[in-house]
Curated annotation (Swiss-Prot):
Annotated source species: Psychrobacter sp. (strain PRwf-1)
Residues where ATP binds: G29, R30, S31, G32, S33, G34, K35, T36
Entry protein name: Nucleotide-binding protein PsycPRwf_2129
Gene3D superfamilies: P-loop containing nucleotide triphosphate hydrolases
Any Pfam family matching the protein: PapZ_C
Family label: Belongs to the RapZ-like family.
InterPro entries, sorted: P-loop_NTPase (IPR027417), RapZ-like (IPR005337), RapZ-like_N (IPR053930), RapZ_C (IPR053931)
């Protein structure tokens, strides 16, 4: 890192886009500094991410996505691969975006790290610096590549609204820093999902509860056509204390541990409740847990319910 390079990791200016507004964030930085990690974090926060697009297409793509595609949060990754052949045109493209969206809607985030840290990271990953891989500049060693890259990225770093030095940051600290900058709230979503084991276990489930041990309304002819959402099925389950016991056991566990996800940078948690066909037992418990958790969990946690096998239900 050069002596005159300014690094800011505090006093951030949070972005809090108003409803319906467009937020364009240009993300750039030195190779090995964590730019890709930042883009992944932004994607998790709901940004539509484009990385390594040719500069000549950047402005048109932004307009296409925001005006025709309805994208409101857009992150554009620009690095040495994009910039090296056309660095002089970045300022013009940046001005075009500013004129189109307004100066308060277009920001630049520049990611960097100390040169010694970058060298250590390249050594640890055994990756080749992009400028050495193509060798357009006849660069023979990593320190020279880092210096040349820093010079090439100067049009971007010089206009940056925020520069993040990742030298001493772990991934969790980086996430919090990015979240603070973009003004993201601390909300997570809990998806309560009913499913049938006969159709497979959901691969994205964080918790899976098997309720096949409970009495099955399927074997009652008058209930077979019903679902776990029907009052007749609820009345059936009311005759079996173990149904209420299992519901309370699952609820107490989730009520205790789901809030902990707020402290671990999780934004979506899927709670899957499974029975054989995904029509009676799992649906009843999923609906019950949805109602109970909606009442008890902190308001930062949004609870939703979905029944995966609904298409298999028969009238």
């Amino acid at each position: 890192m050069s002596a005159n390079e300014s690094v800011v990791t505090a006093d951030l200016k949070p972005r809090v886009p108003s409803t319906g507004s467009v937020d364009v964030l240009i993300v750039s930085g030195r190779s090995g500094s964590g730019k890709t990690s930042v883009l992944n974090i932004l994607e998790d926060l709901g940004y539509y991410v484009i990385d390594n697009m040719p500069l000549s297409l950047l402005s048109d793509a932004a307009h296409k996505l925001t005006e025709d595609g309805g994208i409101t949060n857009l992150a554009l990754g620009v690095d040495i691969r994009t910039l090296k052949a056309d660095s002089a045109s970045f300022s013009a493209i940046y001005d075009t975006l500013l004129n189109s969206y307004g100066p308060d809607k277009v920001r630049i985030m520049y990611v960097t790290a100390q040169e010694s840290v970058l060298v250590a990271r390249f050594a640890a990953t055994r990756r080749v610096h992009p400028l050495m891989a193509v060798n357009d500049y006849e660069i023979k060693n990593l320190p020279s590549a880092i210096i040349k890259e820093t010079e090439t990225l100067r049009p971007i770093s010089g206009n940056a609204d925020i520069t993040i030095d990742t030298s001493q940051l772990n991934i969790h600290q980086l996430k919090e820093l990015v979240r603070e900058y973009v003004g993201a709230d601390n909300q997570i979503t809990v998806n309560v999902l009913s499913f049938g084991f006969k159709y497979g276990v959901p691969i994205d489930a964080d918790f899976v509860f098997d309720v096949r041990i409970l009495p099955n309304p399927h074997w009652e002819p008058q209930l077979r056509v019903k679902t776990g959402k029907d009052t007749e099925v609820a009345a059936f389950f009311a005759n079996f204390p173990q149904v209420e016991e299992m519901k309370q056991d699952i609820y107490r566990y989730l009520d205790r541990w789901l809030p902990e996800f707020l402290h671990n940078n999780r934004h979506t948690v899927t709670v899957a409740v499974g029975c054989t066909g995904g029509k009676h037992r799992s649906v009843f418990l999923a609906e019950s847990l949805y109602s109970m958790l909606s009442e008890s969990l902190p308001r930062e946690i949004k609870v939703m319910v979905k029944h995966r096998e609904k298409a298999h239900w028969k009238a």
